């Protein structure tokens, strides 16, 4: 049996990470790949479109009902979705109580011990990326995920999160085999977005794997709890996800050790691309507005 490809999608909350990952994985199945998704986001929305349902019951919530995780069976937590993709959500605690990363650690250990990784070509971790704390870094830190794909956009906070995630990868790249597979830009139609995404990828010693164009068909599919590949398989957007899946499939062993940049360098980059303004520019604009009002 060939080695399992263990990949992870990281990205800041609200960037479209779970939507992008599920559409990409649905396209990977078309390439004949067997897939297990492990959702590592407390929102537990990493498998919704694959299962065509509301959020899946999580390992932590089921363990709480059963008494402990040892009282669970694999079939309690693992559901089969679109084209037999295996789906698991690790879950998290109530807001303000405990560490959400604990669910990730508990889930991965349980799944490995109970044979969930048997007979799959890919394991995909869908991970919250605003905070690269110990728990959320678990797939990286414990040498589970080998290829990290960062979902980002041309917005400042998405770029900031992408750079932070690169720092997390760098921290563990020396002790394990984890590498940055590349950046995936989810178009938000900001100024010079494609150029900026390519420039950041280059600065991080990586590449822009794919630029996913914005298309309302994604929202139409989501409202029906489906991936675009299921909802509109012949659409241009479905083909974008197929192209992204093909690029990831052909990217095995091509990941890099990232070179994250400082906050100052990131701000300089944003100034260079006209996304941020200098203090002088902002003062000049303010003076012009005040002058216009005075007239």
From Swiss-Prot:
ATP binds at residues 11-18. [4Fe-4S] cluster binds at residues 99, 133. CDD domains: NifH (cd02040). The modification ADP-ribosylarginine is found at residue 102. The reversible ADP-ribosylation of Arg-102 inactivates the nitrogenase reductase and regulates nitrogenase activity. Keywords: 4Fe-4S, ADP-ribosylation, ATP-binding, Iron, Iron-sulfur, Metal-binding, Nitrogen fixation, Nucleotide-binding, Oxidoreductase. GO terms for biological process: nitrogen fixation. One of its GO terms (molecular function) is metal ion binding. InterPro entries: NifH/chlL_CS (IPR030655), NifH/frxC (IPR000392), Nitrogenase_Fe_NifH (IPR005977), P-loop_NTPase (IPR027417). The key enzymatic reactions in nitrogen fixation are catalyzed by the nitrogenase complex, which has 2 components: the iron protein and the molybdenum-iron protein. This is Nitrogenase iron protein. It comes from Zymomonas mobilis subsp. mobilis (strain ATCC 31821 / ZM4 / CP4).
